[in-house]
Amino acid sequence: MRSLALSLHQKYNHTKMKKYIIDLRVVSLQHFNDKYVLLKLSSDEKLPAMLPGQFVEVRVDGSPNTFLRRPISINLVDYDRNELWLLVAAVGDGTRHLASLHEGDTLNCVLPLGNGFTMPKTPEDKWLLIGGGVGIAPLLYFGQEIVRMGAKPTFLLGARSESDLLELEEFCKLGRVLITTEDGSAGEQGFVTNHS
């Protein structure tokens, strides 16, 4: 089966994709720890085409110190359920406010932004996807689309400690997962860029 993202990438390669401003409803929040939260958002309308590696800009209403939209990587898109997942690291006023949202709250988003990742040309291509911390966010959607093409990615995921390893079950469903933690509490000790 041909991947939606691959066909979209071929269609929109070297052209600008149309941008949309849409309201998305929070359908669930998953707090991994006090720093990371997964927002699952839903639209009443059909979601526009989005490529792995693209991002959204989220307007943060109700945060007095946040004037600009916050860029957040697209973690996953489920077109059948009309859901968009965003993995947020609560490190500033704007992202802390996003992490404190509740089910039913609405977020105004501009999407899709950015060019997206280069997709494999054939299922035989080998892919090593590397990310650490919240930088793993776009790799889940990317890995999902690589698997849909028939390829098998390997993920190299890093975090400060075991409690900061995010969405491991989801990644393990898609391919081999190698882990690096800075404190050595899981996987190999060190930075993800130094994994052996």
Which residues make up each language-model segment?
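N-terminal amphipathic/basic-hydrophobic helices that include classical n-h-c signal peptides
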Residues: 1-16
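Generic N-terminal simple sequence motifs
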Residues: 3-4, 44, 134
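Intrinsically disordered, low-complexity N-terminal regions enriched in serine/proline/glycine
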Residues: 11-13, 35, 190, 194
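Generic alpha-helical secondary structure signal
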Residues: 13-16, 59, 145-146
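Intrinsically disordered, low-complexity regions
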Residues: 14, 18-21, 156
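Ferredoxin-reductase
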Residues: 18-103
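FNR/FR-type flavoprotein reductase catalytic core
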Residues: 93-196
